[in-house]
C-alpha cells in the first residue's frame, strides 16, 4: 500500500494557525519582496506536509518527510526565491521539490516551474498537493536533479534545495545567459546559500543570501544515493 505523504485538509489545522503566521516569520527573516509575501499568504502549507506534522504546518520550521529528507523552512524558501528576483515572466527549474510547497510559491511568482525530485513517491505526492491547490503552471517529475531537465531548458532561474560543494555543470548549461541560480554550497550541514548569475565568462557568485543547514544533493552530480 502506498504511504500517504501529504493529504491533510486545511481545516484539520487549528483555527489559530494560518499562512499569515508564516508571512510574519518571512518578514522577520528580512524578506521584503511583496510578490513573495503574497505567495506565502496565498499558499496553505497545511496542504503540503505529512498528516503527522500538520499541527506544525504554520511554524517556521523544517518538517521531516520520507527518505530522510526535510522540507525547507518557509522563511528560507522565501529568502531564496527573493534572491532570484522573479517578476512573473520567468521559466524556473526547481531541484528538490519535496512535497511541493516551495514549488507552489515559485508557481505564484514565476510564469511556470519545472520541478524535479529523486523519489517517485515524493513526486506523486507533490503532484497531488499542487493539483488540490489548483496550481497548473508547475510540473514535477522524477529525476536526478543535478542533471536538470534538459528538454525544457533554457531556464531564466534555477533554485537548488540541497547542498553540494559546487554547482552541477548541467544546471549551469541549462541556465540562460543573464539567468540567476541559488544553491547552498557545502557538504550538507551548514552552508552558504549563494546567489549566482550566468555571464559571458560563466557562473559568477553575486551574493551570500544567508547561512543555513540543508540535506545533501544526491545523484550523478552530487553524492551517491
Q: What residue ranges belong to the model's regions?
A:
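Class I SAM-dependent transferase core
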Residues: 2-95, 101-105, 109, 122-136, ...
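Conserved nucleotide-cofactor-binding alpha/beta core module
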Residues: 85-205
